[in-house]
A protein has these predicted regions:
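Short gly/ser-rich loop at a beta-strand->alpha-helix junction or flexible surface loop bordering the NTP-binding
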Residues: 1-253, 388
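Surface segments flanking catalytic/ligand-binding clefts of nucleic-acid enzymes
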Residues: 29-32, 37, 43-44, 52, ...
Length: 388
């Protein structure tokens, strides 16, 4: 029996209150919340109906709909994502990302269209269905892990499929689920609430039914690492406690497996990559007697400040006592203005006696190099005088 309904109702009120107060809520750019708790899904490619495109193409070519030239023109300009919808080829995911998916998919399929785009197409073709699983996570503002997953819909009909990449998996739930309503350019689509999406995604990550690339971490199975990444993102976006996760996943995830994943969870991690670094380096850090915390606020003089005080920077990971500062630098840190700001902050921290390490996604993939860098950092930090 699904146990997260009460938390989902609380989240709806929390989100609505935050939107009324500030005009926004803490989600990814793909989703905004209206004051009533309705999602407005905006910033990903819209699936295009094939029938009007085919008619328009035939008119432009001045041929009948059945002509092979119409099909050839469609194939040149569009990629089909479902039985009745397509996207322009310019809206397809990068080739390197699409090519990486078959190795992880149980049937070796690839999905050139993103999960949210496919979800909208399948929802339009299946009136009354509710988007669930990884596609629901994407619509709820957590798209990072979803693109290579099959679209899943809750439906009153029997469970089946998919038989090919253009079909969704239809699931008949044992118990009814109260859906949230999303809107994309005025069209409504039903989506499962956050806690139900979390539970189903964690279950599939732990079972290995859906997977994505993660580095090998000694002592941790890839399935558990992925489950921790998913939990961290939901906790960060929807501000969930460990107790919320336990309650919300009741009936969907085995208690013992969930407890093991929660023990490794960091609710302050801003991305899946930020989840990985502590998992990789934790044995080294603990071996040197150093405890690292996430999201540490520092003032202009490099000393810690409270949540309501002005701050110069927020450490992604660090130790006040051992004067360690760690940052995760994503692609946005390559911008000139951001690089200048990062350099200024690094110089200020070094002047304040802190040791600074900036970690990129490429460094996380090379676990051996990351371990060596953290070992050197910890050895230096442990041998220095501690902060008073």
């Amino acid at each position: 029996m699904y146990g997260g309904a009460e938390i989902d109702r609380r989240l709806r009120w929390t989100i609505a209150a935050e939107v009324r107060r500030t005009g926004r809520f803490n989600t990814e750019s793909a989703v905004a919340f209206a004051a009533g708790g309705v999602l407005r899904v905006e910033s990903f490619p819209e699936p295009i109906g094939l029938s009007p495109v085919r008619r328009h193409t035939a008119e432009l070519l001045r041929v009948s709909l059945s002509e092979d030239t119409v099909t050839a023109e469609l194939l040149a300009r569009y990629h089909r994502v479902s039985r009745e919808h397509a996207i322009t080829r310019g809206d397809m995911k990068p080739d390197w990302l699409v090519d990486s998916e078959p190795a992880r998919h149980p049937r070796g399929w690839r999905y050139p269209a993103g999960a949210a785009t496919r979800a909208l197409a399948h929802a339009r073709e299946n009136p009354g269905a509710v988007v669930t699983g990884w596609a629901a996570a994407a619509l709820l503002g957590i798209p990072e892990f979803s693109d290579g997953a099959d679209t899943q819909l809750l439906t009153r009909s029997r469970s089946r499929g998919p038989d090919d990449p253009q079909e969704p998996r239809l699931i008949r739930p044992r118990n009814p689920v109260e859906a949230w309503q999303a809107r994309h350019r005025g069209l409504a689509v039903a989506v499962v609430p956050p806690m139900y999406a979390l539970g189903t995604c964690v279950r599939e990550a732990l079972s290995g039914r859906h997977a994505w690339d993660v580095p090998a971490i000694p002592g941790l199975a890839g399935e558990r690492v992925r489950a921790v990444q998913v939990i961290d993102r939901f906790r960060r976006v929807f501000v969930l406690s460990a107790a919320d996760v336990r309650e919300g996943c009741a009936g969907l995830v085995h208690n013992r497996e969930l407890a093991k994943a929660l023990k490794l969870s960091d609710p302050s991690a801003d991305s899946g990559w930020e989840t990985l670094t502590p998992l990789i380096v934790d044995p080294i850090v603990r071996g040197h007697g150093i405890a690292l915390r996430s999201q540490i606020r520092l003032g202009e003089d490099g000393s810690p400040v409270g949540p309501d005080e002005p701050c110069m920077t927020v450490l992604d990971l660090g130790s006040v006592e051992f004067r360690v500062a760690v940052y995760y630098d994503g692609g946005n840190h390559l911008e000139r203005r951001r690089r200048d700001r990062d350099a200024k902050i690094t110089a200020s921290l070094l002047a304040a006696g802190r040791m600074v390490l900036r970690v990129s996604a490429g460094m996380v993939r090379d676990t051996g190099d990351l371990v060596r860098r953290f070992t050197a950092l910890c050895e230096s930090a442990a041998g220095r005088p501690r902060a008073g």
